[in-house]
Amino acid sequence: MKSKKKRTKHLKSISAWVVSADMGYGHQRAVFPLKDISEEGIITAGKNDGSSAKGKKSWKRLLNVYESFSRARGIPWVGKPIFAIFDTLMHIPEFYPIRNLSRSTYQVDLLDRNIKNGLCNGMMEKISTKQLPLVTSFYAPAIAADMHGYEPVFCIICDADINRVWVAKQPWESRIN
């Protein structure tokens, strides 16, 4: 087993842009073990990623929508129907029978439009200053980087099942690992 000193020295030679999002704790937890290789520390999309005021507002709005729907279930009378809408949007089809699930969805098109309108631009400007691998635990930064032609991009899947929105609009053209 390598000594801690040798391991630490080796880690100093490895560097990557490490990006997360405040969409539940799972995304932050997934990148925490990578803090020692993160260039400029762990970047949180919409917070310390170089986003403009407009970009930060977009991320805040997304977080508010996510949290509102996630917590809606606890509201008497209307909570369950509101959560059902959210659950429908986040529906993950059964794996079997195996079939082609690459068709774009409403969420994929919405993400595509948001990225084209500037979502993740601050992050892209920041990571473009130094060509390092991008490792992210949230799909939006990975897909934005892929759309901008940035390489290499690695996306950590935090859940056992993933929604179609975690995959590029044209998955066969994507370079995300």
Regions found by a protein language model. Name each.
Residues 1-13, 54, 67:
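Positively charged, low-complexity intrinsically disordered leader regions
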Residues 38, 121-133, 142-154:
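Glycosyltransferases and closely related glycan-assembly transferases
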Residues 32-125:
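Conserved N-terminal ligand/cofactor-binding loop architecture of enzyme catalytic domains
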Residues 20-32:
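A short, glycine/small-residue-rich beta-strand->loop->alpha-helix junction that serves as a flexible
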Residues 26-28, 141-144, 162-164:
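Short, well-ordered alpha-helical microsegments
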Residues 148-177:
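Active-site-proximal region of nucleotide-activated glycan assembly enzymes
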Residues 137-139:
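Short His-centered aromatic/hydrophobic patch
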Residues 12-21, 46-48:
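Nucleotide-activated donor-dependent transferases that construct or modify glycoconjugates
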